[in-house]
Amino acid sequence: MSLLGVDIGITGVKAVAFDETGRQLASAYEEYSLLFPSPGARELDPRKVIEAACRVIQSAASQTNDPVTAIGIASQGEAFTPVMPDGRMIGNTMIFSDARAEPYVRPWSESFGAERAYRITGHIPYTMYSLFKFLWLKEHQPDVWASAWKFLFFEDLLAWVLTGETKTDYTMAARTMMFDVTKKSWSPEIMETVGLTPDRLPEVIPSGGIVGTVKREMASKLGLTPDATVSVCGHDQPVGALGCGAAIPGKASYSIGTVECVCAAVDRLIMSPELMAANLVIYPHVVPDTYTTQGFNATGGSVLKWVRDNFATQEASEAHARGEDPYERIIAAASSEPADVILLPHFGPTGTPHLDPRGAGVLFGLKLSTSRAEVLRAFLEGITYEMKWNLSILGDAGIQLDELRAVGGGSRSETWMQIKADILGIPLTTMKVTEATCMGAAILAGNRASESWAEPIRTFEPRKEYASMYEDRFAIYKEIYTSLSKAREMLSEL
């Protein structure tokens, strides 16, 4: 028997089959395109997403001799799709970064109360959450709002197509900002402000809970056994944390990709003033009796992509010609010592702790003597200072981390991992698993959450000789951000 983990992302979907010991048997991946129909709009065509998901399931299942007995689905959060009972999907799906709902955030917060909302949901009002996208949909597409039978999130949308049942899990429900994280149920008082009733949303079950078995016609189409179970496993970040063995208090996953995210596990529901002030969420983890809080940098790896395309074209061209990774060449070209130039990596709306839609990148401290190598080093460090800010706030709230487990494309660079460990002051372990979210989903689908399939590769210890140097630079980093508040506002109005 084999277990299949599915990860429905923003730009593509993966399916990976594992045996019962965590050995990878097969995998498949397919991309799809983001849509930008109007200013601020970012959508996916849900029909194409689900079609792609079905194809990768079929492909992965066909590559293994062991029949797939359980499918676990994880996905991006916040995005919902209006559906009809006959299986039709209405319109497109607004993803987390769709900004059209921003005008609804402040009026709703002032009316309901931001702290009151946080005490119920563990989330601070912000445009990414489903609640505000529902308000936008209700006003701007009233026909879709009125005619929709249910609104499903990507994990439960795929599960519905496979089984005919509509269920989601605690973590996905939490990302709507309409879920009571204490009672672990939809919040009637918040849903009332939107004009929604629970019957128009999926039933909520624990992460990894079984939705049903694959419908006979779908099993035949995808090459699955009719008795294969389908589980909704959760929001991709905590599922990925489980996959890399970091769903344990004191540990956190560190996803280093287009977006950087630290997903920490805690053993109790902490709703502290420090977390609230820093926009740091708290909601159930995918592991029972555990909660998660997350800090993220919305423009992490995407800033390095900007460097590649605009500032390091020679390295990128040489790497392409030789079939090498351009980012490794960029990192190798950076200075070997801490830079005296400080980068604020806000090349778009920021992540936590600021959640500032007026984000603006800053390169501070340039001199005639500044070298290109030092500027490249500043980019590597600035992205990491942003995550250090998040981790320092977690520490102030009593959440102490003794290890970060790094996954994602950025974790392949040993040089960058050592820089990050030095700046963060926490041991950083790289992992053998390349598809942590798919592995986490497979673990949950197989009811093996108490096990760890994760294999560490190397731990990078912080070097003491760099500690004070980076603390001094981090203090400057924070001062730059704070001092430029008025300038960011003025720039956004140009």
Label each region the model flagged.
Residues 22, 44, 70-75, 94-97, ...:
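Active-site nucleophile and cofactor-binding loops and adjacent substrate-binding regions
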Residues 49, 110-126, 223-225, 250-254, ...:
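A polyampholytic, Gly/Pro-enriched intrinsically disordered region
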Residues 53-69, 140-145, 188-198, 220, ...:
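Phosphate/pyrophosphate-binding loops at sites that engage ATP/ADP/AMP, CoA/4′-phosphopantetheine
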Residues 180-288, 298-299, 315-329, 411, ...:
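ATP-dependent carbohydrate kinase catalytic cores
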